[in-house]
A protein has these predicted regions:
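Glycine-rich nucleophile elbow surrounding the catalytic serine of serine-hydrolase chemistry
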Residues: 1-16
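Alpha/beta-hydrolase-fold enzymes
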Residues: 14-119
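Mobile cap/lid helix-loop segments that gate and shape the active-site cleft of serine hydrolases
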Residues: 108-144, 151-152
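Catalytic histidine neighborhood in serine/cysteine hydrolases
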Residues: 123, 169-177
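Short, conserved loop/helix-junction motifs that constitute active-site signature segments
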Residues: 146-149, 175-177
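Short beta-strand/loop motif that positions the catalytic acidic residue
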Residues: 149, 155-157, 161
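Conserved alpha/beta-hydrolase "acid-adjacent" motif
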Residues: 162-168
Length: 177
């Protein structure tokens, strides 16, 4: 059994499709947690992913070799400003109140740097061009097809996820064989 969570989901789908094409299914089942493999309905995050934005991100990452986690967190926060930006500006900055500790706040601040090569490929090939879902992605000369995956697959989507919208997760879940 193998698990893919968030960005690990497209990577898992890619791996399973690659193995299936080579008749090398090494796993009995796979679980995808809030993970997209079809980015057609990827939601508001697609507002930040067009040719101009991708060029800017690529140039930014070329300097340091990674995307700083704080930048990624800022983009995610901008997807839900009513919940993740404005309460802190009003309560903390304007009213001088201390933020209440809660698990989402801690989790949201725990960002990870994204290696440039990985992030560039992910944004361009998955989000922008949706190659895996369209059957246009190749890995090592092997054309990938999610429909060739024959092991049992479980997908979990959460109702209010602003990064992996449930409609996108559901659409991708239907692509497996």
């Amino acid at each position: 059994t193998i698990l893919g969570y968030c960005i690990g989901g497209p990577l898992l789908g890619t791996t399973l499709a690659f193995l299936a094409q080579r008749n090398e299914e090494h796993y009995n089942s796979a679980t995808f947690l809030v993970a997209q493999v079809d980015f057609q309905k990827a939601g508001d995050l697609k507002l930040f992913i067009d040719d101009a934005q991708l060029k800017n991100i690529e140039a930014l990452m070329a300097k340091d070799g990674y995307l700083d986690g704080a930048r990624m967190s800022t983009v995610f926060n901008m997807l839900r400003p009513k919940d993740l930006i404005w309460p802190y500006i009003i309560n903390n900055y304007m009213l001088g109140k201390q933020p209440a500790a809660f698990d989402l706040l801690y989790w949201n601040q725990d960002s990870t740097r994204m290696p440039a090569a990985n992030h560039n490929y992910y944004l361009r090939e998955f989000y922008h061009e949706n190659k895996l879902a369209l059957g246009k992605m190749q890995l090592g000369g092997v054309k990938l097809d999610l429909g060739k995956i024959r092991i049992p697959v479980f997908h979990l989507a959460t109702r209010e996820d602003h990064i992996s919208p449930p409609k996108s997760v559901f659409t991708g879940a239907k692509m497996f064989g």
